């Protein structure tokens, strides 16, 4: 226990909260260029081929970003927008690509939950 005199001299040190998305640098989204587009397998109980891209951001960071939805049009040198949000079964993937923004097209034939995948309202 610190004495009153010690607290007057030094004071309590506040613990700084570590960011879960450091590459965004307190921004909601960041723009970047795909350097590699590939598939990877998830951790133990799950099985799939998850679509991931490596992105060089305008902030200078290079991060892995998950491409959600069925099918995508991304390739090397595509300009994408990324947001925070990890993928629990892919270690090291802490960002998502925003579908329907910049070079990343929205998901085709998406009827429900369209806003998350950049899909326009279908014509009746």
Curated annotation (Swiss-Prot):
SUPFAM superfamilies: Nucleic acid-binding proteins (SSF50249)
GO MF annotation list: rRNA binding; structural constituent of ribosome; tRNA binding
PROSITE patterns: RIBOSOMAL_S12
Protein's UniProt keywords contain Ribonucleoprotein: yes
GO CC annotations on file: small ribosomal subunit
The keyword Coiled coil appears for this protein: no
Keywords noted in UniProt: Methylation, Ribonucleoprotein, Ribosomal protein, RNA-binding, rRNA-binding, tRNA-binding
InterPro entries: NA-bd_OB-fold, Ribosomal_uS12, Ribosomal_uS12_bac
Residues carrying 3-methylthioaspartic acid: 89
CDD domains reported in the protein's UniProt record: Ribosomal_S12
Any Gene Ontology biological process: translation
Transmembrane segments: none
Disulphide-bonded residues: none
Entries under HAMAP family matching the protein: Ribosomal_uS12_B
Function: With S4 and S5 plays an important role in translational accuracy. Interacts with and stabilizes bases of the 16S rRNA that are involved in tRNA selection in the A site and with the mRNA backbone. Located at the interface of the 30S and 50S subunits, it traverses the body of the 30S subunit contacting proteins on the other side and probably holding the rRNA structure together. The combined cluster of proteins S8, S12 and S17 appears to hold together the shoulder and platform of the 30S subunit.
Subunit and partners: Part of the 30S ribosomal subunit. Contacts proteins S8 and S17. May interact with IF1 in the 30S initiation complex.
Family assignment from sequence similarity: Belongs to the universal ribosomal protein uS12 family.
Stated name of the protein: Small ribosomal subunit protein uS12
Native organism: Psychrobacter arcticus (strain DSM 17307 / VKM B-2377 / 273-4)
